[in-house]
A protein has these predicted regions:
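Surface-exposed short loop/turn segments
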Residues: 71-116, 122-138
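C-terminal motif of bacterial Sec signal peptides marking the signal peptidase cleavage site
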Residues: 14-17
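Acidic, polar-rich low-complexity tracts and alpha-helical solenoid repeat scaffolds
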Residues: 23-26
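Bacterial signal peptide processing site
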Residues: 19-21
Length: 166
């Protein structure tokens, strides 16, 4: 029993030493500890909150208590038909999600001027499983929101790391 406990502890140390992180966790700089999210749709906010929690980052309740403020200005979801069947039904769609944002520090200084993040995905529309397609589209949209959040966080990381080296 003691050998098993020792093995578990040693294995845990090896995992952390090699840089292993749980899925969804991001390695973020110290400057990104308390973040306030201003704006955004419910789905975007849910994904943002999930990514922050997985990365051990606190979401501040107000901008006054935040080290960083992420302003979401505009979100746009589009769906475009890419191909049609011989009967005229849509076979393939392209989903497009665009979000505009900027990042401020705790003193309202602009760290990242207004930028746009664009995520696109295609998916096949099986005419035999119409109900399942709605669920598939919602799942894909959730993944698109998550990809956008990760892209925004990556841009923030680059800005914080470059300002730390100055």
């Amino acid at each position: 029993m003691l050998i098993k406990k020792i093995f578990i502890v040693v294995f845990a140390f090896y995992l952390t030493a090699c840089g292993f992180h749980l899925r969804g966790a991001l390695d973020l700089p110290a400057g990104l500890k308390d973040v306030y999210l201003d704006g955004g749709s419910d789905m975007f906010r849910d994904q943002f909150k999930r990514v922050m929690e997985n990365s051990s980052i606190q979401l501040a309740n107000s901008p006054e208590h935040a080290g960083l403020i992420v302003h979401i200005f505009n979100e746009d979801n589009r769906r475009q038909i890419l191909s049609l069947s011989s009967g005229g039904a849509a076979n393939e769609f392209e989903l497009d999600y665009n979000v505009q944002f900027e990042v401020l520090d705790s003193h309202s200084k602009v760290l990242l001027a207004r930028e746009s993040m664009d995520v696109k995905r295609d998916y096949f529309n099986n005419q035999q499983a119409i109900l399942a397609k709605d669920n598939e589209e919602m799942t894909i949209r959730g993944e698109m929101y998550q990809q956008a959040v990760r892209g925004i966080v990556s841009r923030i990381r680059v800005v914080l790391e470059s300002s730390a080296h100055k």
